[in-house]
Amino acid sequence: MNGEEEFFDAVTGFDSDNSSIGEFSEANKISGMIDLDTSKSTRSGKNGEKPQQENGIQKHRTALPAPMFTRSDFSVWSILKKCIGLELSKITMPIAFNEPLSFLQRITEYMEHVYLIHKASSQSQPLERMQSVAAFAVSAVASQWERTGKPFNPLLGETYELIREDLGFRFISEQVSHHPPISAFYSEGLNQDFRFHGSIYPKLKFWGKSVEAEPRGTITLELLKHNEAYTWTNPTCCVHNVILGQLWIEQYGIVEIVNHRTGDKCILHFKPCGLFGKELHRVEGYIQDKNRKKLFIMYGKWTECLWGIDPASYESFKKQEKRGDQARKAKMDDGPEKANSDVPGDVADDVPVAQETVQVIPGSKLLWRINSRPPNSAQMYNFTSFTVSLNELESGMEKTLPPTDCRLRPDIRGMENGNMDLASQEKERLEEKQREARKERAKEDAEWRTRWFSPGNNPYTGAPDWLYAGHYFERNFSDCPDIY
């Protein structure tokens, strides 16, 4: 896969944050702190003075430079009506439907709840570790809630790095193929307690009134202290009412997390909305051992929280609940069923009303709870506090970043600053520049060469994957391509 196909701005990234109580409180205190550079020797303040807080924990911005603009004057249908039946990765969308982030930065949002990985690494029992890993897998998609803007499709060779010394990890990603679009990422704990890596290439489908992103690619988490590896894929994400009405998102599908050392599995069911919206955002699942004996039950909402309880207590509660439901059902009549059509030109689907909270079963254990979003989130593309900081470009960072880092993309920067005309012009320029570069490689019969990842097979599943080749943080960027 050399990415030598024609350049298109793909509708990718509909694919992939959180406080809790007790032991999770420390994660909340540092949610606004970020460090983006390990090369402290190259960073300095005025007169060459070192910045304060040598541990790299710094307070970053809490708002974007400009508020989000209205999309009310733009019609998705005017574009999509010409493309029914086509591969969505080849549809050029106007910048009005973007959010000011690259898909590589969207992937980085997996790390907002990295404290759950650290917690798993510190736990002595495999069952407890699987609980924390499952909570991390659910939390990794939580930032997508109400995020209806499309991230910018990464250019071939684009990269993004993030170092959070306060959260104990560093992260690097690269766009390794353009068509099909494939984004590879690698993260590791600064204390060498974990490795987290994968490659993402969503399959997109247009269903008339909705766009569905089916995840492709394996996600792998290695807990080095325990010599354990966990693998899974993300649930399917669907954006409804792309033609008419209020946009809303749901995630659905089965996520199977495998512990390749013990044989334990966690099966998580991200439930579809259903006819009356009762199941919207709900997640249910269980952990089983290699003999398929259920060890633990989990339930919650990917937009809110995840709880767990032992199977016996769960079954007892469900039996009592069922008896109560049967008594209530005899007194209720839900009326005629609602028609469910997905034909272009029909009226918009009603946005289902989710139940406000999760009913907590007595004796349950809280595994994860989402962070509150900043009060101005709705004016910032519904970004979380973690997300708001991802594209911030600190003074002097250009000296340590490679020229391919997406913080340096002028179209994303223009949109973030509220200059939509500039952003659109730069987007078109970058697309044309990449087309010309592809043509030049074709003339010279030269294949694209990735810098930081190489194609291979996942060491645990055997599936095709892109593996981190190392050396990025040595910061030799002399042969990086000029893509901007």
UniProtKB/Swiss-Prot annotation:
Pfam families: Oxysterol_BP (PF01237). A 1,2-diacyl-sn-glycero-3-phospho-(1D-myo-inositol-4,5-bisphosphate) binds at residues 90, 178-179, 431-435. SUPFAM superfamilies: Oxysterol-binding protein-like. GO terms for biological process: intracellular cholesterol transport; plasma membrane organization; protein homotetramerization; regulation of presynaptic cytosolic calcium ion concentration; regulation of synaptic vesicle priming. This is Oxysterol-binding protein-related protein 2. The modification Phosphoserine is found at residues 19-20. It comes from Mus musculus (Mouse). Keywords: Cell membrane, Cytoplasm, Lipid droplet, Lipid transport, Lipid-binding, Membrane, Phosphoprotein, Transport. GO terms for molecular function: cholesterol binding; cholesterol transfer activity; phosphatidylinositol transfer activity; phosphatidylinositol-4,5-bisphosphate binding. Intracellular transport protein that binds sterols and phospholipids and mediates lipid transport between intracellular compartments. Increases plasma membrane cholesterol levels and decreases phosphatidylinositol-4,5-bisphosphate levels in the cell membrane. Binds phosphoinositides, such as phosphatidylinositol-4,5-bisphosphate. Exhibits strong binding to phosphatidic acid and weak binding to phosphatidylinositol 3-phosphate. Binds cholesterol, dehydroergosterol, 22(R)-hydroxycholesterol and 25-hydroxycholesterol (in vitro). Residues 35-61, 319-348, 423-454 are annotated as: Disordered. It is a peripheral membrane protein. It is found in: Cytoplasm, Cytosol; Lipid droplet; Cell membrane. InterPro entries: OSBP_sf, Oxysterol-bd, Oxysterol-bd_CS. Transmembrane segments: none annotated. Residues 319-340, 424-450 have a biased composition (Basic and acidic residues). One of its GO terms (cellular component) is glutamatergic synapse.
